[in-house]
Design a protein with these regions (language model features):
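Beta-strand C-termini and the immediately following turn/loop, strongest in propeller blades
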Residues: 20-22, 42, 54-65, 102-114, ...
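Ankyrin-repeat and related helical/solenoid repeat scaffolds used for protein-protein interactions
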Residues: 218, 229-286
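Asp-box/WD-like beta-propeller blade repeats and closely related beta-sheet repeat scaffolds
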Residues: 85-91, 95, 104-145
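Hydrophobic packing within well-folded, soluble alpha/beta domains
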Residues: 120, 142, 148-151, 163-168, ...
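Multi-bladed beta-propeller domains
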Residues: 30-47, 72-88, 123-138, 167-182, ...
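Bacterial Sec-dependent N-terminal signal peptides
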Residues: 1-22
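Conserved beta-propeller blade repeats
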Residues: 45-60, 86-101, 136-154, 180-198, ...
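A detector of repeated loop/turn-to-beta-strand junctions in beta-rich toroidal repeat architectures
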Residues: 25-27, 117-119, 160-162, 204-206, ...
């Protein structure tokens, strides 16, 4: 939720209003990447976004600025205590050891964020008061290094959206990409050697990867879809990403025809993981693989 932020924020408010009237239904779903079988975990009357999958078999999702857990056995949705962070967006993720949660939130009491700009925080996985990490705004969290030491994120600095890195403890951020056009959704590979991301540098939104220091960028997709948010599997064998079936330029909108696609990282072959469905913003913004690399969580929608 970062490109054309003012537009996205207005749009978010409009979808919130719709959902408050019961017009939006969010379907939290799981797909098996081997069999293709899909299971609807929960149908929620309202807007839910961006599932993470914890190794203890529950999901973490966003809904209207708050975070919730969804137990995959009981399918119960429970509010997560995020302290003073009450305006979270859909860029959040779980630390490699499963003990911490990174979140992106707008602090209404912080005068530096009066334009509704996002800050990255870290908090205990079971809830608590978040600790601020990024000094500059806006910053949108997407990746956590396998050694647990570094966060990577999309950030707007001087009008350019690029990939940045910062120590988990905070400090000075490092710019990783410098090309024109949006670079978004950065995530580390399981071995920490690569960063996968989506970029408009070619004039079309595609999936790319680079070495962790930003060198040797490599384009991975070449079709006519608008391809967003590559999520490397824990076993480092594949990536899943979301494809808009139409050219959306640099926009990542809700309410579009999309599908999930799977790329084999050894052969670079790509196949559809799901049929086309109604989704987009909120569907799979953040990593949502199960620990065994067999399943993925995502959200599809219906607006009445």
């Amino acid at each position: 939720m970062k490109l054309l932020y003012i537009f996205s924020f207005i749009f978010f408010l409009s979808t919130q209003a719709l959902a408050g009237q019961g017009d939006t239904t969010s379907y939290i779903q799981v797909v098996d990447v081997y069999s293709g079988k899909m299971d609807t975990i929960l149908a929620f009357k309202g807007h839910v976004e961006a599932p993470n999958w914890h190794r203890d078999n529950y999901l973490i999702v966003n809904s209207y600025g708050k975070l919730y857990t969804i137990d995959l056995k009981s399918r119960k949705m429970t509010l997560l205590n995020t302290g003073t962070a009450q305006s979270c967006n859909n860029d959040h993720l779980i630390s490699p050891d499963g003990k911490w949660l990174g979140i992106s939130n707008t602090d209404a009491n912080d005068t530096s964020t009066k334009l509704n700009k996002s800050i990255i925080y870290i908090m205990p996985i079971n809830g608590g008061q978040p600790r601020r990490v990024t000094p500059s705004i806006p910053s949108y969290l997407h990746g956590w290094s396998p050694d647990g030491k570094t966060l990577i994120y999309c950030a707007e600095r001087n009008g350019d959206y690029d990939v940045y890195a910062i120590p988990v403890e905070g400090g000075t951020e490092k710019r990783i990409t410098t090309t024109e056009g949006l670079d978004d959704g950065p995530e580390y590979s399981a071995d920490g050697k690569h960063i996968y991301f989506n970029s408009y540098r070619s004039g079309h939104m595609h999936i790319w990867r680079m070495l962790a220091d930003g060198s040797q960028p490599e384009q991975l997709t070449f079709d006519e879809n608008s391809n967003w948010f590559a999520h490397p599997s824990p076993n480092n064998q594949s990536i899943v990403y979301m494809a808009y079936t139409s050219d959306e330029k640099q926009q990542h909108l809700f309410g579009k025809d999309v599908k999930l696609r799977l790329m084999d990282l050894k052969t670079k072959k790509i196949r559809d993981l799901t049929p086309v469905f109604f989704g987009g913003q909120g569907t799979i913004n953040v990593p949502s693989w199960s620990a065994d690399s067999r399943k993925l969580a995502f959200v599809s929608y219906k607006v009445n």
